[in-house]
């Protein structure tokens, strides 16, 4: 069964990003691409949402106050094992750590073009759909 771009529309994304401007920018871009996005400013704020709603993708910065993105991804896996994880970060060393600790997660390094973000999100969601089938 082939999936087109419209199959991703309304996919539920939880965005955890502590930088207000970046968070707002990402929400606008993802919503414009057709995704439903809930956004929080730290990992600890994401936990109640993960408990109350199913998300297709957790899109998280890695370096955040209170709870970093790697710990958030581990908690997400405990709460909702079928939620895919994708990290965004501006730190190369953090990217290596994330790749070791969350080997199935995609890591996108800042700066990135919004088109690249949307393409990577679609790839991750396509992999999720393929795994379900």
Show which residues each predicted segment covers.
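Receiver (REC) domain active-site loop signature in two-component systems and cognate sites
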Residues: 64
